[in-house]
């Protein structure tokens, strides 16, 4: 029995009841020794062939052999058939065509004079009047020849006068610069001032600079000392056990509890409420699903069909 408030083994597995036994005393048959068509081996209804796929072969048709559509018939003209249908439709007419008792009603709206008092006005008649033959007017007088293009590449076609030609030297800019440079050197009074000494700053960058050479650096000779091996002042302390080698003394034993115990613990004798378990279900596989799984699989889903009873 499980502890109070626990679950049973069946509930822990996930089932709420023990599964029923499928067979009683039947021997196990491996899947290799089983028949290919289990339903046919048990004298059950055999499944017919599946749905036919559309193809050019004879299996794609419903008849066992190909049947001609117009076998034993002559050539038929579509116009002849159409006229024959028209004659048969005309025979169904009982009398002449229906004629209304009154004449056709004229429209009374925009552009119509039906229903007006005066009728149409002859001045606004829609009849075309005879006209004289059209004579094209002559060309305008030309005071100047026609302009050519937009002006680029053509002379004397703009509003203003054409600019007069003025010759310019090839090196005009170079000659102007040379002339200005000569005028600048003419205004100078003499050669630029040049100091005959090496340029130096007002003050030396190094304030501790001295022209005298410094004496050589004296190196102190160090005496070689022979170091002895290190020996500890006291032996090493062992961990655990004896605490005589520690810095602090071992605390004395005290029987007093760290926390005062309570005389009565609340809730220890109270019973835990467990609600009664209701009806529980277990997973059940449908018989229809099992039948579909056996009859329809990945190999025969194209050729299988619904059996008729």
Curated annotation (Swiss-Prot):
* Tissue expression summary: Detected in testis and fetal liver.
Q: Which InterPro entries match?
A: CFAP96
GO terms for CC?
9+0 non-motile cilium; centrosome; cytoplasmic microtubule
Q: Tell me the segments the record calls region Disordered.
A: 220-249
Keyword Cytoplasm tagged: yes
- Main subcellular location of this protein, as a coarse class: cytoplasm
Q: Tell me yes or no: is Methyltransferase among this UniProt entry's keywords.
A: no
Q: Which UniProt keywords apply?
A: Cytoplasm, Cytoskeleton
Which locations, inside or outside the cell, does it occupy? Cytoplasm, Cytoskeleton, Microtubule organizing center, Centrosome
So what family is this one in? Belongs to the CFAP96 family.
Protein name per UniProt: Cilia-and flagella-associated protein 96
Origin organism is Homo sapiens
